[in-house]
Amino acid sequence: MFNLLKPKGASKRRKIVGRGPGSGLGKTSGRGQKGQKARNTSPRLGFEGGQTPLYRRLPRKGFSNNDYKLEYTIVNLGDIDKKFKDGQVVNYDTLLENKLIRKKNKKIKILSNGELTKKVSLEVSKISKSAESLVIRIGGTIKLV
């Protein structure tokens, strides 16, 4: 265990530059002769040498409404069936306790994937039509919060 060897090429030696002509990387340190790339810094990304760059030549277009987009945490009826008992209330807190959702989003949407065999009362933000009909057919209740 303690005398294992690294595979060949696993650790590469650091390039030591500017230490004389015998090293192979002396004098100009592998940077060639004069010019911008031989100096200390290179221009930032998108810089086109003083020419007006592409991102400024093209017009701005469109808008984004993502700041106001409503996102729902999706929970399937099959998961509810596995984690909840008959007659239990399914809401944000109980879903959090049963680790079916994470803390970040309080808006919950129920979808009809999986089988539901238990009467549960749902207190959620949204529910699909197929899931709603399944819950009502079994005898559960739905309250939109």
Curated annotation (Swiss-Prot):
Keyword Membrane included in the entry's annotation: no
PROSITE patterns: RIBOSOMAL_L15 (PS00475)
Record SUPFAM superfamilies: Ribosomal proteins L15p and L18e (SSF52080)
Biological process (GO), any one: translation
GO terms of molecular function: rRNA binding; structural constituent of ribosome
Region Disordered, annotated ranges: 1-58
Protein family according to the UniProt entry: Belongs to the universal ribosomal protein uL15 family.
Function (record text): Binds to the 23S rRNA.
Protein's name in the database: Large ribosomal subunit protein uL15
Gene that this sequence comes from: rplO
